[in-house]
Amino acid sequence: LIASRGEVAGRIARTCRRLGVAVAGVHSSADADALHVREIGESIAIGGAAASDSYLRIDAVIDAAKATGAQAIHPGFGFLAENAAFARAVEAAGLIFIGPTPDVIERLGDKALAKQEADVAGVPIIPGSTTPSEDKAEVERIVRDTGLPVMLKAAAGGGGKGMRVVSTFDGLADDIESAMREAKNAFGSAGLIVEKLIPRGRHIEIQILGDGKGNVIHLFERECTLQRRHQKVIEEAPAANLPAALRDRMAADAVRLGKQLNYRGAGTVEFILQDDAYYFLEVNPRLQVEHPVTESITGLDIVELMLRIASGEGLPLTQAQIACHGHAVEARICAEDPANNFLPSTGDIVHVSFPAGDIRVETGVESGSVVTPYYDSMLAKLIAFAPTRDEALDKLRGAVDATSIFGVTTNQAFLSNLLNWPETRKATFHTRSIDESIGQLTAAPSESNREALALGACFWMMRQRKIAARDPWQSRDLTGWHMAAGDAGLSPIPELHLTTAGHSATIRFAPVQANGAMTVGINDDHVT
């Protein structure tokens, strides 16, 4: 049973089917007609649209597993993937949890406990506290002892939530109170830890795999430095300009930590790197969104490895058998408006098409899908692989520009700008680079020539009328143009969706006038 939704549910199902493993899924009321439900085939309705009424219901997910005769549950990512209580409930029901043991999930889910584990394993940790505190006075004392700038972190947090930068002692008490309140609301615990802020660092993470018996290997590193407000935007593998000796040290530390934990399944050890010094951040005890870039450079299927480990086969590879080839970059296409502070965009997807060819596309949407406010805004991931980093970046930017999505606003132009940004091309970025240059990266592109768009649309219409003469909506003698409505007399049929040079436009036509002129509507503008 796949206890997730969207692109990752479909991705896990494809690997299962390739291995001859039967699959079933779950869905909320909002996802009854979702792409992943049809891709999987057998799917159990587990509740209402809100995640708390469906995908986060441990009892409903386990009941679905029993109803389908499942032997194991793969949590995907998000929702219950890092929930120790869920993992325990799965095992208590006599099922296999495809992931780490509940005890390991619990230890890694608390940032303070995870930091203590890293310290015991001899992995460098960021200066600051190692135990959480809900005492405002104690947190303030730790901040002053550590020295500014610092990061306040919700000990029970994750995914970039419950984090607050403190760069001045002015208003410190208010900052602490706000961070505690946010942590309590988001995670049920107000406990904070304090860490020295690494202001211009790089986010490097190591993919590990363990058999749960002390044997752990790594699949090299990923660079996830390009973030907006602690949320990853572009990921790549391997990291650019990373000295081999430094890479080896980081990988060795990640493996050592995994062995100490008797880690089982796939996990990601995250570090913050500044110059040649690096520090432990956290361990994500699950499949990562960005796992495809690692699969691209190693030729391995991480989901397959997770399944084999869970079935008791152990690690099918030794470290010496794993090699890194080429370069891979991933971009997350999201339904959000960069021009409006990345406000999520919801609604019906009128049309979507992704580039064909040598581009890996992982998506949970199609034409006709509905983007609701209940879940994450990510629509798709595009992954480009090439012999060199420059080639991979070029290929990915071309794929982003070639993707057409109508009906909701997306971050495609922002991604295209980012992939062509000098700091990205030279790999001179740090984790605050996007936030410091957000105005430049979200600047609206120059407007396309409206007259050129109108002329191109007219040629398209004339051609359609010639090749579809038997269609009453398109023929020369009878077209849909008589269905004009509105001030400009624009017909609702046909409607042309056009993308060009990074711009998107919805085009409609008015009837041809007696003098041969015609008005063409381009979004909210009109050209005659």
Model segments located where?
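N-terminal beta-alpha lobe that positions the nucleotide/phosphoryl donor
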Residues: 1-269, 273-290
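Mobile cofactor-carrier "swinging-arm" domains
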Residues: 32, 525-528
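Broad, structure-driven detector of short, well-ordered beta-strand segments within folded domains
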Residues: 204-210, 507-509, 527
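Hydrophobic residues embedded in beta-strands of well-ordered beta-sheets
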Residues: 216-217, 278, 516-518, 527
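Catalytic cores of soluble metabolic enzymes centered on carboxylation/carboxyl-transfer
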Residues: 254, 292-515, 520-526
